Amino acid sequence: IKDYLDFPDFVLEKIKQKTFGEKTIVFFSDLLRVSLLATYGGIWCDASIFLSDKIPLNLRAREFFAFERARNRPSREKLKRIIKSPYFSYGYFNWNEDFMVKMLSSFIIAKSNSHFISALRDILINYWQKEKNIINHYYFVLHVIFELLKKYGYSNNTYKNMSDIECHLLQFYAKNKFDSKLWQEIQQQSFLHKLTHFRTIKKDSMIDKIIIQGIN
């Protein structure tokens, strides 16, 4: 890490002493991704992301970009139809004004030293410098900072009609029996698919056919 980033000493000490909290790796990975992007620019893509197509050139050229919640809440019928995954509750896909977890932090595009990514890095470093409680860390600190920055004039423009719902469509249907028509519909809505860890994978399920067997 020292070869690529000039972190303050307290960050390296927190890693060594595991005082980022119980989820040390998760919390540090948030700081790591925004620090790498602020320093070098590029694309942060978690291992849980599956790309079924190339990342569009006009998206890669953005100063800053992250997928986030659609501004308009889908109908209850649509939510019931698509949110079938056992990994989600209706509470996660929330449109309340005071709800602060609305970004997909597993895929971020940024130019080096862009205002948005630099602000995320600087605030996170300041937060961890002052945070002494090693037990009750809030899991979505990065997401909360993201929403607060938007309230203070930092902008993140959407891409076409894609939101974090479209990015999760394959995960919603992951355990269903493979349906080529459904897979085509999902690909028409999103080139990027946020997945998760699967303890078991049913043969010929959506996730088996697409990820394991490699069907296009």
Could you tell me what each predicted segment is?
Residues 1-29, 47-216:
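Glycosyltransferase-associated regions of secretory-pathway enzymes
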Residues 30-42:
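Small-residue hinge/turn detector
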